[in-house]
């Protein structure tokens, strides 16, 4: 029996919060692709959204590659086996793998929508959401954008004020060893255990590990997970100071690749945290479903929707942002030859 395969591709461009800075660049809008795949009566959606300054591929490159893959996929009837995703750009592999998994019923419906509230610098933003939070209290703070001693003081102040709070901190490799030490100096030793982890404090993994050994502050890998050295030998990076790896599927690749990383981390007793690359609500809800399916006991890092002015196609359960659909001026179908 011949299967009928079809696809549609759309491009979205949504205004975002004007304060959003990615590696010293203001991001005015978030752009990406929405893909729909259909096979007979089954269908699935995915999002392909390279993150400027972080992804290796541009949106144009991703669009070209996705179109070529989808055209080959739709022209085949599946008898020649699966079309591989591994050679594709990470954002393309992830978006296509989500669409295919949805279509085949392999991506579970239930999602983990508990978020770690994200703070870009003003700690007052965190008190209300944290005091209202049920269950485990986890918040995330971006550090490394201001003075290291200020970052240390803010972290210490929050831990002092909310005794059952655990913090995730993200430095994006921005500190020298001496600046990282300056941060630690302002966090009281009795509070350091409640820093769940500090992502990539220093410019190199070796410096970050040394910082963790000297201060007792646990660290997590984020950028390192995508480095060639890590991919060749992950266990080398799973030392006692490392408490988590952060997996951003848009930057890592297909669902299958992400699951491999999760299993490697769990085998070494290390948390795997599914995290956002500032996807639209469509991509974020799929990340929440992935998190529930593969890391059910870990709060994912998905608190980025409020940076956007709109939700796209599928709503995040608790969001009050307006929802746009395929008729919106912000979504354009990509014409197929």
From Swiss-Prot:
Reaction catalysed by this chain? Answer: (1R,6R)-6-hydroxy-2-succinyl-cyclohexa-2,4-diene-1-carboxylate = 2-succinylbenzoate + H2O
Q: Which cofactor does it need?
A: a divalent metal cation
Q: Name one GO molecular function term.
A: O-succinylbenzoate synthase activity
What pathway is it annotated to?
A: Quinol/quinone metabolism; 1,4-dihydroxy-2-naphthoate biosynthesis; 1,4-dihydroxy-2-naphthoate from chorismate: step 4/7; Quinol/quinone metabolism; menaquinone biosynthesis
- CDD domains from the UniProt entry: OSBS
Q: Which UniProt keywords apply?
A: Lyase, Magnesium, Menaquinone biosynthesis, Metal-binding
Q: Which residues form the active site?
A: 142, 248
Superkingdom assignment: Bacteria
Q: Which residues bind Mg(2+)?
A: 170, 199, 222
GO biological process: any one? menaquinone biosynthetic process
- Return the EC number: 4.2.1.113
Instruction: List the SMART domains hit by this protein, alphabetically.
Output: MR_MLE (SM00922)
Say which family it is in: Belongs to the mandelate racemase/muconate lactonizing enzyme family. MenC type 1 subfamily.
What the protein does?
A: Converts 2-succinyl-6-hydroxy-2,4-cyclohexadiene-1-carboxylate (SHCHC) to 2-succinylbenzoate (OSB).
The protein depicted here goes by the name o-succinylbenzoate synthase
Gene this protein is translated from? menC
């Amino acid at each position: 029996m011949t299967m009928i395969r079809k696809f549609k591709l759309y491009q979205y461009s949504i205004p975002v919060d004007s304060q959003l800075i990615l590696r010293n660049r203001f991001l005015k809008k978030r752009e990406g692709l929405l893909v729909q795949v259909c096979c007979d009566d089954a269908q699935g959606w995915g999002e392909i959204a390279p993150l400027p300054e972080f992804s290796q591929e541009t949106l144009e490159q991703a669009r070209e590659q996705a179109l070529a893959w989808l055209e080959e996929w739709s022209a085949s009837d599946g008898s020649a086996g699966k079309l591989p995703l591994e050679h594709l750009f990470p954002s393309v592999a992830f978006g296509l793998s989500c669409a295919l998994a949805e279509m085949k019923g392999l991506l579970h419906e239930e999602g983990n929508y508990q978020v770690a509230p994200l703070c870009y610098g003003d700690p007052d933003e965190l008190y209300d959401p944290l005091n209202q939070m049920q269950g485990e209290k986890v918040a995330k703070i971006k550090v490394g954008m201001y003075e290291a001693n200020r970052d240390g003081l803010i972290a210490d102040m929050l831990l002092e004020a909310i005794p059952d709070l655990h913090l995730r901190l993200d430095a994006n490799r921005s500190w020298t060893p001496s600046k990282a030490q300056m941060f630690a100096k302002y966090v009281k030793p009795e509070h350091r255990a409640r820093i769940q982890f500090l992502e990539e404090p220093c410019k190199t993994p070796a410096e970050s590990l040394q910082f963790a050994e000297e201060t007792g502050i646990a660290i997590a890998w984020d950028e390192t997970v995508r480095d060639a050295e890590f991919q060749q030998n992950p266990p080398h990076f799973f030392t006692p100071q490392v408490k988590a790896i952060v997996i951003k599927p848009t930057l890592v690749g297909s669902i299958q690749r992400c699951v491999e990383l999760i299993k490697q981390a769990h085998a070494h007793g290390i948390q795997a945290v599914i995290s956002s690359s500032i996807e639209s609500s469509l991509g974020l809800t799929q990340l929440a479903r992935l998190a529930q399916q593969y890391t059910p006991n870990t709060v994912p890092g998905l608190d980025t929707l409020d940076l956007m002015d709109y939700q796209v196609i599928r709503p995040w359960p608790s969001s009050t942002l307006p929802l746009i659909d395929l008729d919106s001026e912000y979504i354009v179908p990509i014409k197929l030859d």
